[in-house]
Amino acid sequence: MIQQKHDLYPNLCTQFIDNSHPELYEIIKLSIGNPTNAKIHAVLENYKTLNHHLIGCLLDNRLIGIIGIQLIGLDVNIKHISVQPEYRYKSVARHLVYAVIRNFKVVSIAAETDDESIGFYNKLGFKCQLTENVYGRRYQCILDV
């Protein structure tokens, strides 16, 4: 992957992550509602399929953030994004979104989110629309690249 310097962490490494990475289970469960072992394993199995990718941020060889995406033609759907609690609000998630933009030829990025994360997507320039589904109040967010 192409590396881009991070302001706070100059030794931050962004790379593709295999779904068997030893730290992946603990970090991806942060982005899964009501995570159970079965649910987490099912999510990780999806990343074995074609057009699904995991990109991680490693700091001193420790996985501190992850973004899971699905490529659909020239579009990307963010399926999961999570950052270890001690590294939140330090631009790690933004760094992950930019890694997707730098490394895939895409025209748009979509994500579904909640009230807790809507500000993150707005700051990155996503256009977000309120929707309701079985999970309650959600937002459909789109970024034209």
Each PLM stretch: what is its role?
Residues 1-42:
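Short amphipathic alpha-helix that is part of the acyltransferase structural core
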Residues 68, 95, 99, 110, ...:
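Hydrophobic, well-ordered beta-alpha structural blocks that scaffold small-molecule cofactor pockets
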Residues 102-116:
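Conserved GNAT acetyl-CoA-binding A-motif
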